[in-house]
C-alpha cells in the first residue's frame, strides 16, 4: 500500500516556491481565508520556506566550492578603514 502525501508536491524551482509563498502570504494578510484554510496555508508556507532555505544552502555550498581558496574571512575593520 502506498502512503498518500497530505501536502502538495514541492515546486520545481526556487523562483516557483517564492511565487507561491508570496501568493499565500498575500491571501493570508488580506484575510480571505477561513480558519482551516489559513492553517493549511500556514503549513504549506512552512514547507515552502524550508524548501527555499535548503535551495539557498545548496547554492551557497556550490559557490563556496567554486570559490575555493578565494574565500577569506570578512574583516569589518578593514572595510571601514578602506572607506575612510
From Swiss-Prot:
InterPro entries assigned to the protein according to its UniProt record, in alphabetical order: Exonuc_VII_S, Exonuc_VII_ssu_sf
Subcellular location: Cytoplasm
Molecular function as annotated in GO: exodeoxyribonuclease VII activity
Coiled-coil residue windows: none
GO cellular component: cytosol; exodeoxyribonuclease VII complex
Enzyme class: hydrolase
One BP annotation, GO: DNA catabolic process
Pfam families tied to this protein: Exonuc_VII_S
Swiss-Prot/TrEMBL keywords: Cytoplasm, Exonuclease, Hydrolase, Nuclease
UniProt-listed SUPFAM superfamilies: XseB-like
Domain of life: Bacteria
Listed EC numbers: 3.1.11.6
Major subcellular location class: cytoplasm
Catalytic reactions of this protein: Exonucleolytic cleavage in either 5'- to 3'- or 3'- to 5'-direction to yield nucleoside 5'-phosphates
Membership in a protein family: Belongs to the XseB family.
Subunit organization: Heterooligomer composed of large and small subunits.
Reported function: Bidirectionally degrades single-stranded DNA into large acid-insoluble oligonucleotides, which are then degraded further into small acid-soluble oligonucleotides.
Protein name: Exodeoxyribonuclease 7 small subunit
Organism of origin: Janthinobacterium sp. (strain Marseille)
